[in-house]
Amino acid sequence: MDQSSSGGSMGGRLPFNQSFWEEFLMGREGHLPALPEISHVSKSVVRILGGNPGSMHLQGTNTYLVGTGRSRILIDTAQGLPVWISRISSFLYTQKIELSYVLLTHWHGDHTGGVPDLISQNSSLSNRIYKNRPDSGQNPITHGQIFSVAGATVRAILTPGHSVDHMCFLLEEENALFTGDNVLGHGFSVAQDLGRYMDSLRDMASLGCRIGYPAHGAVIEKLPGKLEEYIQHREGRERMMLSALTRQRVQGEGVREGGVKCGLTLNEIVMVIYGRLPQEVIEKALAPSLLQVLWKLTEDRMVGFKPGDPLKRQWFALEQKKRNKVRGCPS
C-alpha cells in the first residue's frame, strides 16, 4: 500500500528497542541448550558457531558449510569476531576444503560481519560473495538461483519480511531449508514488515521442507510444525487486536467529539488485551510489535486510523462495506 495514502509513513512504525529487552532476553539465554562450536549436523552440513552468544543472538550466529567434497558453500559469516574466523580457517585448512560460494541470508551485521576477514584470509573470495541487494563488489542472488557443489544443490528462496533482502536456501538433497532469521531454533523472530513476513512464512511452508537449519539456535527437526506455530502465533495476535477494535465499534463506545466515530489508542488496545501495564513497557516493548500488527491490518483493509502521533492516534475496525474504500476516520 502507498504510504502516503495511509495518513502516515514507515516513520510511524516504532523501532524495536533492543536495550529494553536485554535483561529479559539474558534470562532466556540461560535456558538455551548448549551447542558445540563446530558440529556435523548432517552428512553434508557442518555448523560453525559465530562466537557471539547473547540476548539477541541466542547461542550465537550459525554459519554453515554445505557439501561433501573439497568444494563447499558457506552460508553466512557471523559477526566478524576473531574467534569465528579462527574456527572456520582452521577447519577449512585441516579438512582441505575450499569455498566456491559465500551466500548471505541478509544484510544484518551478525550475518555479514565476517566477510572482510574471509577476504583478508583469501583474496580470491572477493568475487564469490552473494547477497540479495548486494553491497559494492558482491554478486546478486535471484529467487530460484541454484548453487551446486559435490553433495549439495542449494536453491535461493526470496523471503523478505524480517529484512527487505532476506533469503532462505533450500538444500535439495536433504529437503532442508536454511531459514536465516525468519524462523529461529528457539522462540520467535522479529519482522521489519509484518505483511511480507507472513507471506514469506507461508511461502516457506509451501516448500514442504522437513528440516530447518536456522541462523540462530538448534536444528529444527520438524520444520512444518515450527512454521505453523509461527504463523498461528502471529495470526492469533492479529485476531486479538481486531477483536478488541471490533467490540469497540459494535458497542458504540468509540463515539468522540462531534459524533465522529473513532476507535482506541494503542494504550487503550493494550488495556483491553493485557490489562494495565507500565507506560515504559507499552512504549518500549509492546508498541513496536503491536503497531506492526495494526499496520498490517490497515494494509489488509480491516482497520483504519485517525492520523496523528503513532502512540496517540485512534485505530478502529472498518465495517465490511467500508473495507474497500480509502482508509480514514469514518464520519
Swiss-Prot record:
The keyword Transport does not apply. Keywords: Hydrolase, Metal-binding, Zinc. It is an enzyme of class 3 (hydrolase). GO terms for molecular function: beta-lactamase activity; zinc ion binding. GO terms for biological process: antibiotic catabolic process; secondary metabolite biosynthetic process. The active site is at D110. Its EC number is 3.1.-.-. It comes from the Eukaryota. This is Lactamase-like protein nscB. Gene3D superfamilies: Ribonuclease Z/Hydroxyacylglutathione hydrolase-like (3.60.15.10), Winged helix-like DNA-binding domain superfamily/Winged helix DNA-binding domain (1.10.10.10). Pathway: Secondary metabolite biosynthesis. Binds 2 Zn(2+) ions per subunit. Lactamase-like protein; part of the gene cluster that mediates the biosynthesis of neosartoricin B, a prenylated anthracenone that probably exhibits T-cell antiproliferative activity, suggestive of a physiological role as an immunosuppressive agent. The non-reducing polyketide synthase nscA probably synthesizes and cyclizes the decaketide backbone. The hydrolase nscB then mediates the product release through hydrolysis followed by spontaneous decarboxylation. The prenyltransferase nscD catalyzes the addition of the dimethylallyl group to the aromatic C5. Zn(2+) 2 binds at D110, H111. It comes from Trichophyton equinum (strain ATCC MYA-4606 / CBS 127.97). Belongs to the metallo-beta-lactamase superfamily. Its cofactor is Zn(2+). Pfam families: Lactamase_B. Zn(2+) 1 binds at H106, H108.
